[in-house]
Amino acid sequence: MKNHAFHVAIIGGGLGGLCLANGLKKAGISVAVYERDQSPDSRPQGYRIHIDTQGSTALHECLPQHLWDPFRSTGGDFSQGFSVVTQQLHELLNLRRIGGREDIIARHRSISRITLRRILLAGPGT
């Protein structure tokens, strides 16, 4: 059986399309992303977004290490716990997650949509 080169065209350079492009490229598949916007900054991209544990895991699987590191370092982590503070924000009570080791990959994160898009754009070479 002949082994043919596989090339995928992705229509749409939003977060989903760019994540797919990075995952395919990481798997050794040739990718081209087609986007209607002239540049990454041609229109407003919104604010910060929440990425849950499944999203963080998916991004870790799709991104090469040199892109995962900036994602992890620029995104804010959500702690698993509960705090009570005064009106001056002095902590009165802090109940943190007890037991087990926290997973550094599968965790809730908050990241700027613009920053995430720039990280994802750095991968496919588009």
Annotated model-derived regions:
Residues 19-21, 35, 59, 120:
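Generic structural signal for small/hydrophobic residues in well-ordered secondary structure
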Residues 25-47:
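Glycine-rich FAD pyrophosphate-binding loop
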Residues 3-33:
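N-terminal Rossmann-like FAD-binding beta1-loop-alpha1 element of flavoenzymes
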Residues 20, 43, 94:
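Short glycine-/acidic-enriched loop or helix-start segments at secondary-structure transitions
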Residues 2-8, 52-126:
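Conserved N-terminal helical subregion
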Residues 8-12, 42, 51:
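Short glycine- and Lys/Arg-enriched binding-loop motifs that mark or flank ligand-binding interfaces
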